A protein has these predicted regions:
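Short, Lys/Arg-rich flexible segments
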Residues: 1-75, 80-81, 95-160
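His/Glu-rich zincin catalytic helix
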Residues: 84
Length: 160
C-alpha cells in the first residue's frame, strides 16, 4: 500500500521513521550476536560454583533509537540492575561491592588473583571477539537492513 506524502515535513518524518527502524534492527541483531559470544565464550565453560543464573548474558540490551544532532543512534550497554546480587558470594553483593570495577571487564580480561569474590580466572574474551565481529560485519549488516526499507544511509560505528 502506497502512502501519499503531501509535504516536505511529512516526507522527513517518514524517512526518520525508516531510519529508526533500520537502526533498531541493527542494534537488535548486534545485541543478539553479543549474547551469542557470551554463550560461547563465557557460558561454555563448565560450571564449578553452582547456581549459574545466566543473568550476565541477559544483562545486555540496546536503547530505542533516538535522533541526536541529525544522527539516529542506539546504544548497546550492560544493565547491571538485571543481575541478581544476593548471597555472600554474589559478585558485587553487600559483602564486596563492584563499584570501581566492571563485571564485563573481569570476565573479558580475567583476573590474576582473587578479587571481588572472584577466584583468579582466565580471560573469556567475549567482548574482544564481539568487537572483531562488529568491526568486520557492521557495514554489511547496516547496508542489508537499509535495503529492506529501500533507503541508503551513511553509517558509523563508535565504541565508548
Amino acid at each position: 500500500m502506497s502512502k501519499i506524502i503531501n509535504s516536505v515535513e511529512q516526507m522527513q518524518i517518514e524517512i526518520d521513521l525508516l531510519a529508526q527502524n533500520v537502526v533498531r534492527n541493527v542494534a537488535r541483531i548486534m545485541t543478539e550476536k553479543l549474547k551469542d559470544f557470551i554463550d560461547t565464550d563465557v557460558y561454555s565453560y563448565p560450571e564449578t560454583w553452582g547456581g549459574r543464573t545466566g543473568d550476565f548474558g541477559n544483562s545486555w540490551e540496546y536503547s530505542e533509537p533516538i535522533f541526536d544532532f541529525g544522527y539516529v543512534e542506539s546504544i548497546i550497554s550492560e544493565n547491571l540492575m538485571k543481575i541478581q546480587f544476593d548471597g555472600a558470594w554474589s559478585h558485587g553483593s553487600n559483602y564486596s561491592r563492584m563499584e570501581e570495577f566492571n563485571l564485563a571487564e573481569i570476565i573479558n580480561n580475567g583476573l590474576d588473583s582473587s578479587n571481588f569474590n572472584f577466584p583468579a580466572i582466565e580471560s573469556r574474551p567475549f567482548w574482544d571477539n564481539w568487537m572483531m565481529w562488529a568491526n568486520t560485519e557492521f557495514d554489511n549488516l547496516f547496508i542489508s537492513e537499509s535495503k529492506k526499507y529501500g533507503i541508503t544511509m551513511n553509517r558509523s560505528l563508535s565504541f565508548k
